[in-house]
């Protein structure tokens, strides 16, 4: 059987065939005798079991087409599935549907999935390992756990006079960025309590001060732009 499957860019569907017939044809292409049970299992898995069996792929929504494409890719039980931008153009429900299908394939069917995507917030919800690339070169390869543990904390400060506060913090070994309504401190030797003391000594009224973890998206851009 086909042990590697891929969906690159637009899925290759037979638009004049139903979902069932598309899957049946794919099994024939892989040299297998079409099995009704197997086709029904895949239709269930990708959420197309309740679609009108006469409905042709050309009349499917973008999300349905993408789910059928995944069905075609897994009908022959591959060990590795390669997906290129699998959620491009999908609405929030379509994105969640694809994410749920991929999680099932990974957890219940033990399929390794390699996803190339620019939508980092989505990768953050499903990936176990990352290969980060820039200009065609691999710049980092690591597990999600390792990357998460290395993500720095930043401190967010909001005061009555942010322009004055940033000068005081900068003079006290803080790397600061002034945002529209707050200050972001990304590197400092001070604790939050020490920052509060420094600002209060200088009669700065503090509205809020808290720690926030750098997001994976910020981590990625810092890594890529630092090169």
What are these regions (language model features)?
Residues 24, 36-52:
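Conserved ABC ATPase "signature" region
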Residues 56-63:
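Conserved ABC ATPase signature
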Residues 70:
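Hydrophobic anchor residue at the start of the ABC signature
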Residues 81-85:
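Catalytic Walker B motif of ABC-type/P-loop ATPase nucleotide-binding domains
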Residues 153-223:
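Short, charged/small-residue-rich alpha-helical element at the C-terminal edge
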